[in-house]
Amino acid sequence: MATAALVRPLELGADIVVLSTTKFYTGNGAAIGGAIVDGGSFDWTVERDGESVFPLFTTPDPAYHGLKYADLGAPAFALRARAGLLRDTGAAISPFNAWVALQGIDTLALRVEKHNANAKKVAEFLATHDKVAKVNYAGLEGSPYKATQEKLGLKYTGSVLSFDIAGDQDDKTAAWKFIDALKPVSYTHLTLPTICSV
């Protein structure tokens, strides 16, 4: 779960970034949306054994008078997404959802900072708990992921973590006991019903 306030994938070598604006960007999950960010650096003309690896970009599109998207250069992916996926599915964010997402961007940096501070406290607590065998969180000293955070020069590691419950990994009793004791929470004004199904 990353945002541009946490990490900038294009600067780290990614060619295309797909993100959800529903999660961190809105700040409250009140809008549904997403984005595709094209760095414009990917070579869509690559061939293997004389065949195009990406035929949707290199073969003529009859819907657009034989246009070959790869011939357009840097904007090839973004234009293919608009001219194909968006045209065929209508997957455009509504004006209201766009407005709600924009409201959340004002406080994004502050929220990311707080999310990370809270996640680190939870990870540190779990790391010392006798019923936890292992915590997977790059913000912990000694984490095998810490070196990656430092190599990338990231101030934060994100607010998502996982952990393994202590005990025999083949005996799932402790895991089911933990799962059965969980109570779903909501971080918005919304409430969850008493009985939730996954």
Residue ranges and their predicted role:
Residues 9, 13-17, 141-147, 188:
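N-terminal start-of-domain structural block
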Residues 1-131, 136:
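Conserved PLP-enzyme active-site core in the AAT-like
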Residues 188-194:
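Conserved small/polar residues in nucleotide/adenosyl-binding loops
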Residues 89-92, 96-98, 107, 113-114, ...:
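Conserved small-domain helix->loop->beta segment predominantly found in fold-type I
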Residues 197-198:
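Glycine-rich phosphate/pyrophosphate-binding loop
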Residues 38-40, 165-167, 194:
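Non-catalytic surface loops within mature trypsin-like serine protease
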